[in-house]
């Protein structure tokens, strides 16, 4: 099933983002085992951005050049949900499971103003949305801190809506 859904190679950054999220999801699924269906959370986490690469067009060097027409019209959330629906039907996955996975993909941006088609309304979709936000924000911090000296404050970071301070050297 995963080979059918994922298809071509994902960007390295997207793969790292998903891998980081999978580790966090696995940990939090254990922490909240009384509320979370671990399998559903991990499946939704793995699939949440898999249509993202089809949202863009790429140069011969593999660099994003612009949004694809389909990416502009639908976006990766809708394209991902459509593919999950089609593949799940083809594989005989129960419709209720397919709908939950589609909901997780459609809601993982959390709020409509951040691109979500719907708000997350089950525990797994809420947790996926929070994990996605956490990992994306930490990546912004990683990139910003790498360009700062100890004791320096960055200019305003649009995606964070604030500045970033580097209080100490990084360990990594």
Question: Positions of the model-derived regions?
Answer:
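Glycine-rich, flexible loop/turn motifs
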Residues: 1, 63, 156, 160-161
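Single conserved hydrophobic/aromatic residue that forms the stacking wall/gate
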Residues: 1-7, 11-12
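Conserved structured catalytic cores and adjacent interaction surfaces
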Residues: 15-17
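Short, surface-exposed polybasic-aromatic patches that bind anionic ligands, especially phosphate groups
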Residues: 21
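A Trp-anchored, charged/polar loop motif used as the substrate-binding/catalytic surface
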Residues: 24
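Divalent metal-dependent catalytic cores for phosphoryl transfer on phosphate-bearing substrates
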Residues: 27-148
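N-terminal intrinsically disordered, cationic/polar leader segments
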Residues: 129, 153-158, 169-171
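Long, highly charged low-complexity segments enriched in Glu/Asp and Lys/Arg with interspersed Ser/Thr
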Residues: 143, 160-162, 167-168
């Amino acid at each position: 099933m995963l080979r059918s859904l994922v298809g071509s190679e994902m960007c390295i950054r997207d793969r790292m983002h998903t891998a980081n999220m999978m580790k966090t999801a696995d940990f939090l699924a254990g922490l909240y085992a009384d509320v979370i269906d671990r399998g559903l959370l991990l499946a939704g986490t793995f699939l949440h951005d898999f249509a993202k690469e089809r949202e863009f067009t790429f140069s011969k060097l593999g660099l994003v050049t612009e949004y694809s027409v389909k990416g502009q019209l639908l976006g990766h959330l809708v394209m991902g949900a459509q593919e999950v629906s089609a593949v799940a039907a083809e594989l005989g996955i129960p419709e209720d499971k397919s709908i939950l996975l589609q909901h997780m993909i459609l809601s993982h941006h959390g709020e409509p103003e951040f691109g979500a088609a719907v708000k997350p309304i089950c525990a797994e979709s809420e947790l996926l949305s929070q994990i996605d936000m956490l990992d994306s924000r930490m990546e912004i911090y990683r990139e910003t801190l790498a360009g700062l000296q100890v004791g320096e404050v960055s200019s305003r970071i649009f995606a964070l809506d604030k500045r970033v301070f580097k209080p100490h050297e990084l360990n990594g």
